[in-house]
Amino acid sequence: MRPSRDDRDRDAYVSIPYTTAASEFLYGLNVVIAALKAKRRKMYKLYIHSRALTNPASAKTIRVLCKQANLKREDVDDSFLPKMDKMAQGRPHNGVILETSPLPTLPTKSLGKFGVTDMSIGIELAEQSAEEVQINGNPNSIPFHYTHTWRKPLVLLLDGILDPGNLGNILRTAHFYSVDAVAICTNTCAPVNLPVVQKAASGAAEALTILSIPGPANFITTCKKHGWIVHAAVAPNAASAMAGKKNLFTSSMISPLSRGPSILMIGAEGEGLRANLATKADANVGIRGVKPAIPELDVGVDSLNVGSSVAVLLEAFMRKPDNLEDVVKGTPREDDVAARIV
């Protein structure tokens, strides 16, 4: 139901308390708990309504995390709900809202060379303002999620993902598959710090390394010089039409992560990757569907949405080739296996 004129007039006069001009408000239990666990943001204040504490386990988790973070907590009643609604931009907040600094997103010019024994991924940062340095820091490397010995790093590059819900869903999928970093083209994608993106990601964005890419074409060119293998996600018919490119399909491909560090480029739903990025790929990757056996059931749905496509693609990239032995990190034979499969 649409808000009445009186409701809109009332909301216009509801003031929101900000600790800093750059403060953001995270809403929803899963997102707030994820942010408190990840500890990657500055935490200013937690607003919590009694209805958010009806689940004893959730209430205990919030109390423990607030104590660990030395976070100021304000218990509010129904009179504060108009402010909570405005903080959450009218979206469901479950009675819990966290005021924080923005999520770190590293403006990145290039990924560095990745050596056989490297446990992190070198990066070259673009210029940052003093305010950005306060949020992001000034690192020269990012973590490699070195859980299994058979694979090298995977970075997911997103171009043209304008829908905040799609972006959030992709971030959630990337976290599920332990992607090492998500690189977001800043001029063509929705802002990652939108609260609706964080909500759609269900807290997964808090655990991801996120790179902002101001110059994606130069980024890809330099990464290739540093030994990164670049793949473009394309429709199957587009893959076959691209002469001179190696064309892979998720159903039968051997993961390129067994050979070297890789970047997987994902384009906009419908339009796909921009040509200036697609032409830089070393190989194309497509997803083949299965045609209905009964012609009457073929209603013309011949593709997946971008979120579903990313899930299928990442499963293929993270699928260990059958001919490779794998040892989970921390076992005695880790170094021996790592040396043998590179």
Which functions belong to the PLM regions below?
Residues 113-148, 242-246:
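Charged, glycine/proline-rich intrinsically disordered loops and linkers
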Residues 232-302:
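Active-site/ligand-binding-proximal alpha/beta "capping" segment
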Residues 10-20, 134-153, 254-258:
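Intrinsically disordered, low-complexity acidic Ser/Thr-rich regulatory segments
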Residues 33, 173-177, 192-204, 275, ...:
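Structured adenosyl-cofactor binding patch, chiefly the S-adenosyl-L-methionine
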Residues 45, 181, 282-283:
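Well-ordered beta-strand positions
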Residues 1-124, 334-339:
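N-terminal positively charged helical leader segments and presequences
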Residues 26, 73-77, 207-219, 285:
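Short acidic-hydrophobic, aromatic-tinged amphipathic segments that line or gate anion-handling sites
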Residues 139-245, 326:
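RNA substrate-binding interface of SAM-dependent RNA methyltransferases
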